[in-house]
């Protein structure tokens, strides 16, 4: 499962979500963290919404990948709750 976490330096909610993702043992997660301050497009799109978690989907034999934005969970969610949500995908 390939995930993208849109974040920025000093974002404690982002850091908390990243730590929880790293604690998940039952799913193989390839996590890419993108700093929104390095891209004007990302910054404009996500500046008020981070942390944003997206699933990268590839279509069959095609090399093209698309991002599917995942539902935002409460910062108080547990690792188990996050894991349960991700298992749906």
Show where each model-derived region lies:
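Alpha-helix C-terminal capping segments
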Residues: 21-26, 86
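Local sequence-structure signature of Cys/Sec-based thiol-disulfide redox active-site neighborhoods
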Residues: 1-23
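Structural micro-motif
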Residues: 47-55
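Non-catalytic, surface beta->alpha helical segment in thiol-disulfide oxidoreductase systems
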Residues: 57-89
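N-terminal beta-loop-helix "entrance" segment that forms/cooperates
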Residues: 40-47
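Thiol-based oxidoreductase modules, predominantly thioredoxin-like and allied folds used
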Residues: 28-40
